[in-house]
């Protein structure tokens, strides 16, 4: 599969109108949600997560659950550890969604389905035997021979598009974190700078520990006893699991810490 986060690149060109319609977070979640099956302990079959029917049976329910977790547990916590200039610029866009509103859930469902469709279309042209590959026979032909291993056009397209997509996403993230909107007063924050740094470190350390734990929980022969590509895939999945679990667990802890802060509680009750 292309790197899961690379799929977000398909959403980037439409980020402004999506943000205007409050669809951005749901569409980003949707663009990655078919791959969430790889993060589950029981690993559902690909047809259960990457098919037209899976849009309704897997992508939509899992995407809506992820949307709730993001809005309720992750969004505000992550906002509070951002640098001041990024926090000031993104805060108007980071208002919690009205999770009691039917309209909000309809919009979230549309965003998730739209994002998931971009994922399935991308995969259709980058996986051997997929529908898009069957439509373009050249993608099913060998194009490169590496150490006696023939690399098909679809696989080459998968690797190249994954790297390009990942680069696009990283550039957008770095640009968003570094861009300065001009001189402005430093915002009043619920967390002091040193405490923000501690929480950022907590995210990183927790993700690393959990990724290592998920990796060692598998039999060594299942991780290292196959090809290099298979080994990299297992490491990538363990890393994704660790990052996802850390994002949820640490954000829950930070949310509890923030709710105990009178300033944060008063500020959020007024917005």
Where are these regions (language model features)?
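N-terminal membrane-targeting hydrophobic helices
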Residues: 1-271
């Amino acid at each position: 599969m292309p790197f899961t986060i690379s799929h977000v690149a398909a959403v980037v060109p439409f980020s402004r109108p999506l943000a205007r319609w409050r669809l951005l977070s749901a569409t980003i979640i949707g663009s990655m949600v078919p791959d969430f099956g790889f993060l589950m302990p029981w690993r559902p079959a690909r047809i259960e997560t990457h098919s037209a029917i899976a849009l309704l049976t897997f992508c939509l329910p899992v995407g809506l659950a992820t949307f709730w977790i993001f809005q309720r547990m992750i969004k505000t916590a992550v906002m509070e550890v951002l640098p001041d200039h990024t926090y000031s610029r993104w805060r108007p866009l980071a208002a919690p969604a009205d999770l009691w509103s039917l309209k909000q859930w309809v919009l979230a469902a549309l965003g998730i389905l739209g994002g998931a469709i971009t994922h399935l279309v991308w995969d259709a042209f980058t996986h051997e035997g997929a529908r898009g590959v069957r439509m373009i026979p050249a993608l099913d032909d060998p194009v490169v021979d590496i150490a006696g291993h023939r690399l098909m056009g679809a696989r080459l397209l998968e690797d190249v598009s994954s790297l390009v997509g990942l680069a696009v996403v990283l550039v957008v993230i770095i640009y968003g974190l570094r861009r300065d909107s001009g001189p402005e007063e430093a915002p009043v924050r619920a967390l002091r700078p040193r405490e923000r740094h501690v929480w950022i470190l907590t995210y990183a350390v927790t993700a690393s520990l959990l990724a290592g734990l998920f990796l060692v929980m598998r039999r060594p022969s299942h991780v290292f006893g196959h090809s290099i590509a298979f080994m990299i895939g297992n490491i990538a999945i363990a890393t994704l699991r660790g990052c996802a679990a850390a994002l949820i667990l640490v954000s829950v802890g930070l949310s509890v810490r923030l709710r105990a802060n009178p300033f944060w509680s008063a500020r959020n009750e007024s917005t």
